[in-house]
């Protein structure tokens, strides 16, 4: 399964997540803009569809889904359901109430992405402006609203093996439809100063996640190209069944045509429906 990301709004986030270059607490050299227009979003959706993406995720920066943001995401989703009906729409808009998530469900959003990021115990070391429990509760709200969950996190922040076990146990409790795995990429502007994970450790993380969540679609996302390099397609032999195709929020991804060619050469077919 291939999924693409649309960075609807970028940067200037008031939260202090230590792994994120979109935080206004640091000065990272990233694109910053308030909001893409509907035409830009539609163009990206059409490109994603041509690249065999099944999922298309509408991502906004900031703490949560306020009324103004909700209205725009609903407008964008309504347009995309009409213009690109083959895409399964995912929303990633931060903390959200049950009532707001019900509105997303009504306009055809299939899944809500809100990552736990790491263990409950380790989270205070990487973020102080909101709590891990806020994230967990938003996922509960999404389930209650009838949305599928897309919930995962990021590895390589300095967390311990016990943290990883605790994190995956929490994911198992939520039982998400899909679970993205991101690998931390160092950036001089970030407070976290951790080296890249080794390729072998990254593949082990994927295997361990797949064992913990056997019914879940394990998606390898940010850091795939840099951490795994020329071994990146081994993820599909180690428990992953989905990848993000194209660019990420603030970093470039693998060239889509290369991913498509490499996957085809390995005998993979691209999913045309979520199941």
From Swiss-Prot:
InterPro entries: Aldolase_TIM (IPR013785), BATS_dom (IPR010722), Biotin_synth/BioAB (IPR002684), Biotin_synthase (IPR024177), Elp3/MiaA/NifB-like_rSAM (IPR006638), rSAM (IPR007197). Keywords: 2Fe-2S, 4Fe-4S, Biotin biosynthesis, Iron, Iron-sulfur, Metal-binding, S-adenosyl-L-methionine, Transferase. Residues 1-217 form the Radical SAM core domain. [4Fe-4S] cluster binds at residues 13, 17, 20. It comes from the Bacteria. Binds 1 [4Fe-4S] cluster. The cluster is coordinated with 3 cysteines and an exchangeable S-adenosyl-L-methionine. Binds 1 [2Fe-2S] cluster. The cluster is coordinated with 3 cysteines and 1 arginine. Pathway: Cofactor biosynthesis; biotin biosynthesis; biotin from 7,8-diaminononanoate: step 2/2. Pfam families: BATS (PF06968), Radical_SAM (PF04055). Belongs to the radical SAM superfamily. Biotin synthase family. This is Biotin synthase. It comes from Campylobacter fetus subsp. fetus (strain 82-40).
